[in-house]
C-alpha cells in the first residue's frame, strides 16, 4: 500500500466508511453523500484495487445481492501519513498552549504516560 493521497470523492467515501463499524454497500454510501451511485462504484473499485478497502462480505441491498465494504486503512493511519512529524509537533504545541481546561490537559498527560509505559 503506497502512501495515500485521496481525491475529494475518495476521501468522502473513506470518511463514510470510517464513520461506522458496519460494512456498507454502495447504495448505503450513496444515501449518505451527494455523489452519484455510478461514481461511488467507480471510486470503490479504485480504493479496492489500491487495498485501502476490502470486500468484507456479500449481502442483500433490498432484494439484490451486493458487495459490502469495510476500510482496511484506519483514519488514524491516513492522518499520520498526511501530517508530517514537524507539522504534528507544531499542531500539538499550539493546541496545548490554547487549552484552558486543566482536566483535559490531565487527560492528555495520562494518554502520554500510558504510551510511555507501553513503550517501556
Locate each region found by the language model:
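Short acidic, hydrophobic short linear motifs in intrinsically disordered regions
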Residues: 22-32
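Short helix-capping/hinge SLiMs at alpha-helix to coil transitions
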Residues: 17-21
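Short alpha-helical "packing" element that flanks the helix-turn-helix/winged-helix DNA-binding module
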Residues: 10-16
